[in-house]
Amino acid sequence: MFITFEGSEGGGKTSQLAALANYLRQQGIPVVATREPGGTPIGDQIRTVILNLENTAMQPRTEILLLQASRAQLVEQLIRPRLAAGEVVLCDRYADSSLAYQGYGYQQFPLEELKALIGFATGGLKPDLTLLLDVDVEEGLKRRAQGGGWNRLDAYDQAFYQRVRQGYLEMAQAEPGRWVVIDTGRPFELVQAEIRGVVFERLLNR
């Protein structure tokens, strides 16, 4: 089963994914946790280029293509083989991040063009379940500021992240069979409990 975690800044994707992965392992369920961009040696090198604060001259089109290159490597080297082996794959961001950030956020590229490019990079591989960890933009940015570790993709204004959040919500509404929206404006434990419930229901019914 292929499960992706999506959301704007400060939603807690990374920590919630790690907690879920640990819990699944405790239950004896084979699981691999990965992330985008990165997740493979080649992808991690691409990630470094994308996030480097010194690369201020990087154009949006360049960024999109680098993200798809990292994604293509991750799908073929890790995700498909692990799924074929019967493992649960948890991914911190995937194709929907490109649509939310480079599509809805930048507002420079037609969504259909991005979808075609993503389809080529992934070979059409879509998640079985996408968890949208949703948080109010202002609250999310406060959490992000407290976390530190800034990178090039953090240098956007609040209006940009509002568009990203709206894009995520529109995608979730358009494909309710795949998406589940999780309100992360609550204590960590409550959010994790809801995530576990959703995931186990899908695992039992697959």
Model-identified regions with their sequence ranges:
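A glycine- and Lys/Arg-enriched "phosphate-lid" helix/loop adjacent to the NTP-binding pocket
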Residues: 96-166
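ATP-dependent small-molecule kinase phosphotransfer cores
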Residues: 29-122, 194
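Hydrophobic positions on the alpha1 helix immediately C-terminal to the Walker A/P-loop
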Residues: 16
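Walker A (P-loop) phosphate-binding loop of P-loop NTPases
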Residues: 10
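Hydrophobic anchor at the beta1->P-loop junction of P-loop NTPases
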Residues: 3-5
